[in-house]
Amino acid sequence: MAAVTSSCSTAISASSKTLAKPVAASFAPTNLSFSKLSPQSIRARRSITVGSALGATKVSAPPATHPVSLDFETSVFKKERVNLAGHEEYIVRGGRDLFHLLPDAFKGIKQIGVIGWGSQGPAQAQNLRDSLVEAKSDIVVKVGLRKGSSSFNEAREAGFSEEKGTLGDIWETISGSDLVLLLISDSAQADNYEKIFSHLKPNSILGLSHGFLLGHLQSIGLDFPKNFSVIAVCPKGMGPSVRRLYVQGKEINGAGINSSFGVHQDVDGRATNVALGWSVALGSPFTFATTLEQEYKSDIFGERGILLGAVHGIVESLFRRYTENGMSEDLAYKNTVESITGVISKTISTQGMLAVYNALSEDGKKEFEKAYSASFYPCMEILYECYEDVASGSEIRSVVLAGRRFYEKEGLPAFPMGKIDQTRMWKVGERVRSTRPAGDLGPLYPFTAGVFVAMMMAQIEVLRKKGHSYSEIINESVIESVDSLNPFMHARGVSFMVDNCSTTARLGSRKWAPRFDYILTQQALVAVDSGAPINQDLISNFVSDPVHGAIQVCAELRPTLDISVPAAADFVRPELRQCSN
């Protein structure tokens, strides 16, 4: 998931005069020697095709693409081979018992600069600092922010200070660091990358927690300068989850959020070890390989899909349906939000999607099948469109433009993001949570389960046909949903889940949730009400899908404990700490 928030955009915009400036294809003043892509390459990246129909009558499935090889070599950590649905992949397990290897992984690094204090910034800065202290390393973790900003004060409260040399100005921190973790908002990265690159030391390492910047550069025919390495470590969850599970796992050899890692360019042979060290220091239970391009496509797509936008659309659509059909508001909320974020998520997390179906009675299975059959292809239609909007660069441009609308310009007012939890449904949710017994996971409501699992399976199928690895597919479609994000909606509602995430994720959820709500209401639910027959081929394919075995393998690698989101959570975004139930 993207590792940024809009507060960082404000910090960068105040420090740079390049914000919102049209981007040129070359930068003579700083002589950064960008690699320019050929017109043929650019056209190839933007091409859109259609493929086989998967037996559907309305929607063609995405064309099948063969996964790229993601093998890697490390001289510091142990690489393990896993088999996921017949595909061999490689991972590195984490754990506090590996912290003593961090000095070797970070060889040649004296200072790690963490730029930004949004969703991921606080978590990553604190986790890295604490892990390096435990490893008895003298590497300095320094946070770079705009002086005088509210974020500067928040970083002080987290134990970083100018006096200790662990807090400073953005640009001096970039210039003085050997590894720079760029965790500002994606739109701020897109508007300020020229200045950022010019401040990096030669042979330093630029670390990203999202491949968005690569996607933006590709969309304008550019690549990174060749005088520094570029790596990525991308936690599969929001920043507050990364920190919370790290703290919870201190007594049990660590727990945290799984991460993907990628090496885009390596100027001196250190990049893989540094990336894996970064991931282990964050507390990742396991780390799997990807590329920056595959990461940004799956990540931006995933958060608009089942991770945030789609699940929001599902519960809005079903709550409205249930109440219109005579169900009480409280029960409708329990049978939508509480069901998905409680028992359904818990079951999928520990036993997989098939266990949800198998836990139902025979009548319950029929309700599940009816909902699944009617929802699968409408869900895929929007998911397919969303993926291709991301892959073509359209969604990336949308994020950049939205970030610029946060500020007054061209005589038009600023348009910050609005609230998403002020409707009747979410007020009902406050009442339901206020009387919910501790540990209550809600009812396993078959129809809701059928729609939710259909969305999850449709997302898996799109990513599979687009050539993503099973580890990436399962993390972006299943694990992040049930282990990192849904627990936050269970705790305090949809805004507490969505708005603890990055700016890119928050924008995408707001944009795409209504699309899923609409298509479910207009197509899936209408099909159910009209008595459309259950597509037994879809049900058979679901029951026998090889992804279930792959999920079981990944479940064995999940965090060693479940995330706890208490009422007085102090590890979330400050503006969300004092919200109501």
UniProtKB/Swiss-Prot annotation:
Catalysed conversion reaction: (2R)-2,3-dihydroxy-3-methylbutanoate + NADP(+) = (2S)-2-acetolactate + NADPH + H(+); (2R,3R)-2,3-dihydroxy-3-methylpentanoate + NADP(+) = (S)-2-ethyl-2-hydroxy-3-oxobutanoate + NADPH + H(+)
GO cellular component assignments: chloroplast; mitochondrion
Gene3D superfamilies: N-(1-d-carboxylethyl)-l-norvaline Dehydrogenase, domain 2, NAD(P)-binding Rossmann-like Domain
One Pfam assignment: KARI_N
Cofactor binding summary note: Binds 2 magnesium ions per subunit.
UniProt binding sites for substrate: 502
Localization per Swiss-Prot or TrEMBL: Plastid, Chloroplast
Cofactor(s) this protein cannot do without: Mg(2+)
Enzyme category, top tier: oxidoreductase
Residues bound to Mg(2+) 2: 299, 476, 480
KARI N-terminal Rossmann domain mapped to chain residues: 92-290
MF term (GO), any: ketol-acid reductoisomerase activity
Pathway given in the UniProt record: Amino-acid biosynthesis; L-isoleucine biosynthesis; L-isoleucine from 2-oxobutanoate: step 2/4; Amino-acid biosynthesis; L-valine biosynthesis; L-valine from pyruvate: step 2/4
GO biological process: isoleucine biosynthetic process; L-valine biosynthetic process
Active site: 210
Residues reported in the UniProt entry to bind Mg(2+) 1: 299, 303
Chain ranges of the KARI C-terminal knotted domain: 291-439, 440-576
Domain of life: Eukaryota
Complex formation: Homodimer.
PANTHER family: KETOL-ACID REDUCTOISOMERASE, MITOCHONDRIAL (PTHR21371:SF1)
Family, as annotated: Belongs to the ketol-acid reductoisomerase family.
Protein name: Ketol-acid reductoisomerase, chloroplastic
Organism this protein belongs to: Pisum sativum (Garden pea)
